[in-house]
Amino acid sequence: MALTKAEMSEYLFDKLGLSKRDAKELVELFFEEIRRALENGEQVKLSGFGNFDLRDKNQRPGRNPKTGEDIPITARRVVTFRPGQKLKSRVENASPKDK
């Protein structure tokens, strides 16, 4: 199961006593600020969590899997995430949840 923005808002409502509206707005503002920074070409560093970076990928040759036809894959900018050491350690040492 995935963690959603709605669940984050609910958690803030429960734990911090924020109104549901304020909790939702806080979550939205947090992600909007990350989006804004990345759109402006900035790296996003979240201490104890990880870094969001931008990476430019060059054009490269590719192949259409259905037809086998050679096609170029266009150059593009992608967002990458590199988890920090604290996050890596916590995930590595966490006990798996029953599914």
From Swiss-Prot:
Protein name: Integration host factor subunit alpha
SUPFAM superfamilies: IHF-like DNA-binding proteins
Family label: Belongs to the bacterial histone-like protein family.
InterPro entries linked to this entry: Hist_DNA-bd, Histone-like_DNA-bd_CS, IHF-like_DNA-bd_dom_sf, IHF_alpha
GO biological process: DNA recombination; positive regulation of metabolic process; regulation of DNA-templated transcription; regulation of translation
Its job: This protein is one of the two subunits of integration host factor, a specific DNA-binding protein that functions in genetic recombination as well as in transcriptional and translational control.
Keywords per UniProt: DNA recombination, DNA-binding, Transcription, Transcription regulation, Translation regulation
Complex and partners: Heterodimer of an alpha and a beta chain.
Disulfide partners: none
Top-level division of the source organism's lineage: Bacteria
Molecular-function GO terms, alphabetical: DNA binding; structural constituent of chromatin
Record PANTHER family: DNA-BINDING PROTEIN HU (PTHR33175), INTEGRATION HOST FACTOR SUBUNIT ALPHA (PTHR33175:SF2)
A single GO cellular-component term on record: cytosol
Annotated region (Disordered), positions in chain: 49-75
